[in-house]
Amino acid sequence: MYNGVLLLHKPVGMTSHDCVMKIRKLLKTKKVGHTGTLDPEVSGVLPICVGRATKIVEYLTEKSKTYDAEVTLGCSTETEDQTGEVTEKKPVLAPPDEQTVQSVLRSLEGTIEQVPPMYSAVKVGGKKLYEYARAGIEVERPKRTITIHHIELTSEIRHEGDKARFRFVVTCSKGTYVRTLAVTIGEKLGYPAHMSNLVRTASGPFTLDECLTFEDVEGLIADGTLSEKLVPIERALDHLPKWIISDTLAKKVENGAVLETPGSFSHLTSEDRIAVFTEAGRCTAVYYPHPTKTGLLKPAKVLVQKSEQ
């Protein structure tokens, strides 16, 4: 049985769900789930939780993401990326200089509001926005607050015919639409624009150079060494506060017991989570402050069973 996080280099042309289904077939298990959707035309880091690690999916989806994106100035599309029909054109006679572009990018750093694109899976009135879009209906979309941690120009600005292109790297919070960001960048530069290429280079602490292709996965399965390449749950939860417990407490944890909050964690809020480790270094559960009983911690996820201790 495989347990851990498989860092997949998602190829262009597959949905995230397609990737999960293929991994299920390759590993011969239904216990597989991804940690954040990538559109079919986007490649890059797609962490896939396998086996017992499917219990920690929600703690990985919250992490920031890093993307390498290309913006094309001179035309916008209905999908805000290279796959959609062109909706507006404006020839780029003289492209903006690097200083101007960098200034626009820097103006987006911090907390900003973003309206999700019509071609997205965000739900409004019980339906996904892309369902309205495909029916030719445009609906009002609620603004979302996102955080741009860092954004930077990474290429020269290329003037190609009546268009201009450049690349940038952005590290942003969960829920950020980089194609909408590309449109916003274009607006600030005075042109209709769209995102013409996107690669996710990092998801939380996981980077592209750690990822496996499907071909890699198949080879490792054949060699019997795939388990060695899976990220252990312990590393995957490294961003959470760590509580090392005694073997006596570990017995209670495996039974899902409510525990007293140690003094070092008395400052926690209801949103915080703690990774509980045994003295041997194994992560056995994730706990959080009890919603109604002050001074107590309650299990959010128990990651081991008695038979596994």
Swiss-Prot record:
<feature type="active site" description="Nucleophile">
    <location>
        <position position="39"/>
    </location>
</feature>
<dbReference type="Pfam" id="PF16198">
    <property type="entry name" value="TruB_C_2"/>
</dbReference>
<dbReference type="GO" id="GO:1990481">
    <property type="term" value="P:mRNA pseudouridine synthesis"/>
</dbReference>
<comment type="function">
    <text>Responsible for synthesis of pseudouridine from uracil-55 in the psi GC loop of transfer RNAs.</text>
</comment>
<dbReference type="InterPro" id="IPR002501">
    <property type="entry name" value="PsdUridine_synth_N"/>
</dbReference>
<dbReference type="InterPro" id="IPR020103">
    <property type="entry name" value="PsdUridine_synth_cat_dom_sf"/>
</dbReference>
<dbReference type="GO" id="GO:0031119">
    <property type="term" value="P:tRNA pseudouridine synthesis"/>
</dbReference>
<dbReference type="InterPro" id="IPR014780">
    <property type="entry name" value="tRNA_psdUridine_synth_TruB"/>
</dbReference>
<dbReference type="InterPro" id="IPR032819">
    <property type="entry name" value="TruB_C"/>
</dbReference>
<comment type="similarity">
    <text>Belongs to the pseudouridine synthase TruB family. Type 1 subfamily.</text>
</comment>
<dbReference type="GO" id="GO:0160148">
    <property type="term" value="F:tRNA pseudouridine(55) synthase activity"/>
</dbReference>
<keyword id="KW-0819">tRNA processing</keyword>
<keyword id="KW-0413">Isomerase</keyword>
<protein>
    <recommendedName>
        <fullName>tRNA pseudouridine synthase B</fullName>
        <ecNumber>5.4.99.25</ecNumber>
    </recommendedName>
</protein>
<dbReference type="Pfam" id="PF01509">
    <property type="entry name" value="TruB_N"/>
</dbReference>
<dbReference type="GO" id="GO:0003723">
    <property type="term" value="F:RNA binding"/>
</dbReference>
